[in-house]
């Protein structure tokens, strides 16, 4: 039997619903339908599919002022995890978070920066040891965010300049080839701002100082 093709619109709708559930913590299908201005059958079908994918779960029932109680929905926060590596002049920070943005583990290790294959290989090994402490299967890791104090050029895929690390034109490929997971590279200030935006998703505008 041929599998049903999913359109971009359907993917975007499912993403909207998932993000709303994550932002809300506990929510019902009628709440989602009302807030996102979608029909209840559409929302119910999408949340059913998200449950089948393991991304959200039923979490009891919500209180009702009358009539049938609505099922409470919440994200399955530990279904997938994300790792982070914060590179500074003298240290590396390692972090593990779940889909709710909750920090599951954090370590800061003294390890002075050096632009060399040995350095990036060792950082990758330290990350693997860090993850093994939590007994995390590799397939549960969505990817690794790597923050560096420098100017990033996403089109050239390189760190164009870092006064702190005293480097220029450091390509992403020069670093990511040592990691077993998909990598995304960010300027350290942007990484911090993104983390705040993720946690404070209800805020439409905010100002970040680092």
Regions found by a protein language model. Give the residues of each.
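Extreme N-terminal segment that seeds HTH/winged-HTH DNA-binding domains in transcriptional regulators
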Residues: 1-34
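Short helix-capping/turn signature of helix-turn-helix
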Residues: 23-24, 100, 199
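Glycine-rich phosphate-binding loop and adjoining helix at the ATP-binding site
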Residues: 107-205
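Gly/Thr-rich phosphate-binding beta-strand-loop-beta motif of the actin/hexokinase/Hsp70
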Residues: 69-106, 207-210
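Conserved phosphate-binding catalytic cores of ATP/NTP-utilizing and phosphoryl-transfer enzymes
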Residues: 58-80, 185-207
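N-terminal helix-turn-helix
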Residues: 26-58
């Amino acid at each position: 039997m041929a599998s049903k093709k999913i359109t971009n619109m359907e993917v975007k709708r499912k993403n909207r619903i998932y993000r709303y559930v994550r932002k809300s913590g506990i929510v019902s299908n009628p709440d989602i339908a009302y807030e996102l201005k979608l029909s209840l059958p559409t929302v119910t079908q999408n949340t059913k599919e998200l449950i089948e994918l393991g991304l959200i779960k039923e979490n009891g029932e919500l209180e009702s002022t009358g009539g049938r109680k609505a099922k409470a929905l919440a994200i399955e926060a530990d279904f997938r995890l994300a790792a982070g590596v914060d590179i500074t002049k003298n240290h590396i920070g390692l972090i593990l978070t779940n889909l709710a943005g909750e920090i599951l583990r954090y370590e800061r290790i003294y390890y002075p920066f050096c632009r060399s294959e040995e350095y990036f290989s060792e950082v990758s090994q330290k990350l693997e040891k860090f993850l093994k402490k939590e007994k995390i299967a590799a397939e549960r890791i969505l990817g690794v965010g790597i923050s560096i104090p420098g100017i990033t050029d996403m089109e050239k895929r390189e760190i164009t300049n870092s006064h702190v690390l005293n480097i220029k034109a450091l390509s992403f490929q020069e670093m990511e080839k040592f990691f077993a997971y998909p990598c995304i590279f960010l300027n350290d200030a942007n990484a911090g701002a993104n983390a705040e935006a993720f946690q404070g998703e209800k805020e439409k505008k905010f100002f970040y100082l680092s």
